[in-house]
Structures are given as structure tokens and as C-alpha cells.
Amino acid sequence: MAENERMYISYNNIHKLCQGVAKHILARNERPDIIIAITGGGMIPARIIRSFLKTKGQKNIPIQAIGLSLYEDLGLDNSVETIGKEVIRTQWLDFGALNQHFDSLIGKKVLIVDEVDDTRTTLHYAVSELEKEIAEQQKVLNRMSEETVISIFVLHNKDKPKRAGLPDSMMNSGRYIAAQTVPDKWLCYPWDAEDIEEHTMLAKAQGHD
């Protein structure tokens, strides 16, 4: 893959993007009750944005992780991957533990975090499956009147046709938040770098620091 087809993103840039989005969320009075990170790319942004969402007098926002796999390694070299057609659930929420320690997700503000919205397939799956399981919990616990509000935060939204959609209620109410919309290039994140100094230098050269 040619270098002009890659975008290098630095930790510094990610830190600033999370800070800006956190200010936006707090200004809208939409501080989440729980953050759900999609592994592995959503883990670091989730942890960073939680720091910026801290509010005096309130507890830290708990972070839960779900594992969803869409990319497939072609085995050609260390960087070539292809986008899979099917979402594979490798890790999911323990609703029993959530109900015991967190009073479930019912009636909560939930923020799903991932690094990139590429084809939107993974995000669609995450939202759809969470909505189904929350609806089931509402029936079991007889809490049908309580609304759970799901939002999404991604660092980057690729400007390209999507293979899947998200609820209109989310898209039309500002609950889908992309810190930046970028061209359809291969995004190189710092947590994938073998040489972080070289990676940061390349990110600076592209203005992504």
C-alpha cells in the first residue's frame, strides 16, 4: 500500500479529539452512565474520553467491553487486512453481573466507543444487539416505561458509502458523534505502530498531531 493511501494518527491527536468530543457531550448534558468500548480499537479512546467526562461530585463512568470482529487477516504481510462480511461476537456483556452491580442498562445513557466508522457494519450490529437485549431485560424486569438512550462516539468516520445503517432517532438527534470525517484511506493508529517515534513523525508530517 502506497504511503499516500495511509493516514497516520498520533496519540496527541487522539487525545485532543476525545477532549473536544467530551466538551460537546457535557455541553449537551448527555454525560453517559456507562461507556461500552468495542475492542480492540475502542479501548484507548474510551479510556481517554472517560477522563474528560469526569464531573465533580460524580463517580467515574464505568467502562465495559464488547468484542466484535469484522476484519480478516489475509496473512500476506503485517498490515494487509480485508473487511469481512459477517460480524463475529467474541466478547459480550454479562447482563447478570450488570443487573447485580449496576442496576442493568435499562433507563441509562449508554455511549458506544470505537476508533473508526468504516462500513458501519460493526456499529450497526452493536446497537441492534444491545437494543434487543435491553428490550428483553425490560420485559423480564417489568420496566417497559424506562428509556435507554444509546449514543455512539468514533474518532473517525470514513467518507464512503456504508453497508449498514443506524437508527434515524440516533442520527437525527446528534447521538452519533464522529470527531472527524476523513477520506477513505487506511488509518494507521498509534497502538498498531511497531516504531512509535517514526509513526508520530509521519503523523506530524501529515498534520495529524
UniProtKB/Swiss-Prot annotation:
Gene Ontology CC terms: cytoplasm
Taxonomic superkingdom: Eukaryota
Residues of the signal peptide: none
GO molecular function, one term: xanthine phosphoribosyltransferase activity
InterPro entries assigned to the protein according to its UniProt record, in alphabetical order: PRibTrfase_dom, PRTase-like
Cell location: Cytoplasm
EC number: 2.4.2.-
Main location: cytoplasm
Keywords annotated in UniProt: Cytoplasm, Glycosyltransferase, Phosphoprotein, Purine biosynthesis, Transferase
CDD domains tied to this protein: PRTases_typeI
GO BP: any one term: GMP salvage
Stated role: May act as a xanthine phosphoribosyltransferase involved in the synthesis of purine nucleotides. Such activity is however unclear in vivo.
Protein name, UniProt field: Xanthine phosphoribosyltransferase 1
Organism of derivation: Saccharomyces cerevisiae (strain ATCC 204508 / S288c)
